[in-house]
Amino acid sequence: MVARSTDSLDGPGEGSVQPLPTAGGPSVKGKPGKRLSAPRGPFPRLADCAHFHYENVDFGHIQLLLSPDREGPSLSGENELVFGVQVTCQGRSWPVLRSYDDFRSLDAHLHRCIFDRRFSCLPELPPPPEGARAAQMLVPLLLQYLETLSGLVDSNLNCGPVLTWMELDNHGRRLLLSEEASLNIPAVAAAHVIKRYTAQAPDELSFEVGDIVSVIDMPPTEDRSWWRGKRGFQVGFFPSECVELFTERPGPGLKADADGPPCGIPAPQGISSLTSAVPRPRGKLAGLLRTFMRSRPSRQRLRQRGILRQRVFGCDLGEHLSNSGQDVPQVLRCCSEFIEAHGVVDGIYRLSGVSSNIQRLRHEFDSERIPELSGPAFLQDIHSVSSLCKLYFRELPNPLLTYQLYGKFSEAMSVPGEEERLVRVHDVIQQLPPPHYRTLEYLLRHLARMARHSANTSMHARNLAIVWAPNLLRSMELESVGMGGAAAFREVRVQSVVVEFLLTHVDVLFSDTFTSAGLDPAGRCLLPRPKSLAGSCPSTRLLTLEEAQARTQGRLGTPTEPTTPKAPASPAERRKGERGEKQRKPGGSSWKTFFALGRGPSVPRKKPLPWLGGTRAPPQPSGSRPDTVTLRSAKSEESLSSQASGAGLQRLHRLRRPHSSSDAFPVGPAPAGSCESLSSSSSSESSSSESSSSSSESSAAGLGALSGSPSHRTSAWLDDGDELDFSPPRCLEGLRGLDFDPLTFRCSSPTPGDPAPPASPAPPAPASAFPPRVTPQAISPRGPTSPASPAALDISEPLAVSVPPAVLELLGAGGAPASATPTPALSPGRSLRPHLIPLLLRGAEAPLTDACQQEMCSKLRGAQGPLGPDMESPLPPPPLSLLRPGGAPPPPPKNPARLMALALAERAQQVAEQQSQQECGGTPPASQSPFHRSLSLEVGGEPLGTSGSGPPPNSLAHPGAWVPGPPPYLPRQQSDGSLLRSQRPMGTSRRGLRGPAQVSAQLRAGGGGRDAPEAAAQSPCSVPSQVPTPGFFSPAPRECLPPFLGVPKPGLYPLGPPSFQPSSPAPVWRSSLGPPAPLDRGENLYYEIGASEGSPYSGPTRSWSPFRSMPPDRLNASYGMLGQSPPLHRSPDFLLSYPPAPSCFPPDHLGYSAPQHPARRPTPPEPLYVNLALGPRGPSPASSSSSSPPAHPRSRSDPGPPVPRLPQKQRAPWGPRTPHRVPGPWGPPEPLLLYRAAPPAYGRGGELHRGSLYRNGGQRGEGAGPPPPYPTPSWSLHSEGQTRSYC
């Protein structure tokens, strides 16, 4: 039985040779019968191999993996870690064993000759760690290393040590270099095949008759069954009877064995006779010579062992630099320095030198000697040095730009665009081997320096590129097939273009700061370039947190609309715009969109309602969402001016406005620069605007009050149709992103001493649509005077309202009997003027939710409390307003019922204050211009049925002078309203009254705008243009105000002893700085009600007894009134100025003539702002007995002294009304009430005299007299993107 070895060529090759058993003496003469030890083979050890590079390689892709059949690294005999690596190339795979030091050697060779670490991204292998777990720590590192290397390895590997590490030759065949491999075992005999044999096992050899086999192992003579030998590169077993050994001295005619018996192969007779006749040379010298010639190593083997040194010219660049230890070739360094010093001559690198000088220089460099270039021979023949330099690069086996990167360079240059081409070429250069990269950089910088001397050498960059291109870049495919004709010219073109591009951009391509990060594999930029600050935003001011949140919320509302401002137009475009050309700016922003931001960039002007004489605009669908967004308060110059960049953007969906402590009343001075910044920003914006017909329209609608331009309508929002719009004013359209609140700014009442700029009778030019610059002192809350200035203008007239039944029940449920206390009058002697608030929303009739009822009841309970007669409420600060009637209203209401409750409570409070004012006998100050009023209350409530007793009232009413006492359940509401007015810190206002200078220009006729006829048609109240343009006034002390010009009113019913003191100290207002107030979950409701100022008529009287708890059942519960006595003194100027009567009142029906003053002109109506914000406050029954009402949860100041309570609600003395149906999503409006100026007269039983009440449209009640000659009050309601106007 013969043992077989598993050693074969396809095996690992590192196993030991299995010896065959020996039973006797040697079977071959002179050869022992034991196992032959494997001597040192012809291949050196891996560490002993000299560094060399193959000239040509073609093996394709190589895959390297840690051997999967090995569980982990093992320890070799030298106690070093050994890892198994599976190498796969050209479909064949074999394992190799390598230590960790071998891995580090491979990494060093790779990054010294093949790759740069910036391109390969391979980590440098650290020294081997110490400890027992070193193997487990190195396995993940080597796995990642081999995986990354497999993705990089291609036919670009020409380094001999690297391929030897993988047991590869330059053609992808396995190269066995192990010393103990069976292929390296020397043979003991040679034999030729005499019998054909086919292998029956993988470790057997197959051969044919006549093949030569080298025998490496033979058993004894007695056992001749199996021998082991080599045939070609295969090692295996074969039967011994199939071969015959060659003998050293064969016999004549036969080739016999040494033992005597012939092998049976006869020799030819002619050959044997010939060989026997020629004597063979014998001797030791002849044998040595024959042995040397047979075993002469090849050139490649001599290079591996370091015996043969490659010359400089024709040697691989990486090999030469590795053997010489230099960064760049010595030939290049010496030649470039010499040429830069002496070679600035005409035709350098283009002309050729003397051939003998070139060969002599080459021999010097090949002999590793540096020639003396400064000799006279070379100084006279400088072109020989330049020719030698080109010769060196031309004879490189692999050109400087390598064969492998020829196609990539060609593709990079075909990319369109200079910048992208630069990036692509830079990426290709990074793939060069480090020796090539360093040499290319050195050569290109040298050629770039020579190109700067093109005036002396006539060799600019293009000429140098044409001369050097064939020496630096070549294609292996074109050289192998032999190109000619068009292909040759095409290659020259590609070569010259690439080299010229490298010469032109050498400083950029080889810069350390140049990077292609952020680019995709194709070289396209993935990261957008940041725009310049001046081009991306108009202001360099940092945004506040609120502004950023508002902008973010606005962008979330419209994800499809870009909100990033575009870069401004170029200077040429701006110059074209100044010359009058229609230049479309990027982003669609222009000066006109600054006024129309809230209404959208393409929303046309809406037409008036049908009952105003116009055509109705198509109503908005009820299910549609308003295309607006809530704007927060703008509290500074920066916040006003920073939003001009948002003009022209798409409307954003309205979001929930965050509550703050500045929602209701101001208690501190407002920033002085607010209005000025707005005016200045508008003026600066107008410098680049273009004049068009729409400019006058925008200016008249948005800035008519400030600029004095003519107006086309009398009401602020009469031209909005029935589509409710709560966008900001047109002049403040740029403030959309700031959550702007129109009620923030207030202006103080005018002072008689302040001069008003007279208005020119001629209409202003349409182009001057921007307001004049306003000084901070003109809009200061307190004016330039001392703090003793009078209080802000306030509403103190009776109010007839229409309240839904649900609100009336809640108001009645929250009341309880309590003693009434007087309220100090804010303006002594002010005439009482009625204001009508019709309920215009159909949704107001809907029942309130439980949460709303609880809020209202709780606030009504918490606001009541006994007030002493000696206590007085602090005066509210003078308001400031930058709004005009032409501006857009505040955000849309969310709950009409809560709105009405707010308005009723505030009106009742003002009426009570007016009563106390008249009881004191004071004279109301005279106002010279109309003003706009703002109400902002927060009313809470409790569920129905939680109140004490008494039926719920139907409306909030103020008793007349004949009423002995107020109802017991109303003081709470008045207390609540006064409390809220007294707790607002200064500087935190979000509501504001409108000052005299903000009167809309549409209310002044006579002007020349193109909308003047339309304004006259839309507005029933037109005023002449001779009215002086009011300016910004500051309040003056009360004693400076002139008395009323009319008959004084009789005193109203006193709620208590008068406690008003004209010389009372000014209230102390706390700073707005402090802990933030808790946010209110209630919704804010805003209304503006514009009514004619100075109405000298009194409110309707009641036909029932003032002591009755409920009005008669025949009265409609949807209407309410506030009784008021006629004035006792002469009315002020602005109260005696009325516009002409509307067309709805025929002249023959006007039985009452209002007093007119010849020197006064009619004034526009004033809007009434109403804000309702209900907070989630629970009922507090104990608060009714407290001496001081509790502070509002959103207030940051002290509650202040107690305030009186509200008067009793009453019903209006008429029957059920017929609703006026109006198509639209919000339902029909309520009929309006008109009053006569005659004092109220009650008959027996409190019956109302006939002829004291009127309805709108000229409809009279039973026995009604003619309507008054003044126009009816005007209302305009904005909600959910729609607007309704009433007159």
From Swiss-Prot:
BP terms from Gene Ontology: protein transport; regulation of dendritic spine morphogenesis; regulation of postsynapse assembly; response to toxic substance; small GTPase-mediated signal transduction
Location of the PX domain: 59-168
Domain of life of the native organism: Eukaryota
Biased composition (Polar residues): 622-645, 972-981, 1019-1028, 1274-1287
Sites bearing Omega-N-methylarginine, chain numbering: R1244
GO cellular component, one term: fibrillar center
Rho-GAP domain residues: 315-510
Listed Low complexity bias regions: 558-571, 672-709, 813-829, 896-919, 1175-1189
Boundaries of every SH3 domain copy: 186-248
GO molecular function annotations of the record: GTPase activator activity; phosphatidylinositol binding; protein kinase binding
Keyword Ribosomal protein set for record: no
Residues with the Phosphoserine modification: S8, S570, S636, S727
Bias kind Pro residues: ranges: 752-766
Site (Arginine finger): R350
Disordered: annotated span: 1-40, 551-792, 813-832, 859-1030, 1056-1075, 1090-1134, 1146-1287
Disulfide bond found in the keyword field: no
One Pfam entry name: RhoGAP
Function: May be involved in several stages of intracellular trafficking. Could play an important role in the regulation of glucose transport by insulin. May act as a downstream effector of RHOQ/TC10 in the regulation of insulin-stimulated glucose transport.
Stated family: Belongs to the PX domain-containing GAP family.
PANTHER family according to UniProt: CDC42 GTPASE-ACTIVATING PROTEIN, RHO GTPASE-ACTIVATING PROTEIN 33
Name of the featured protein: Rho GTPase-activating protein 33
The species this protein was found in: Homo sapiens (Human)
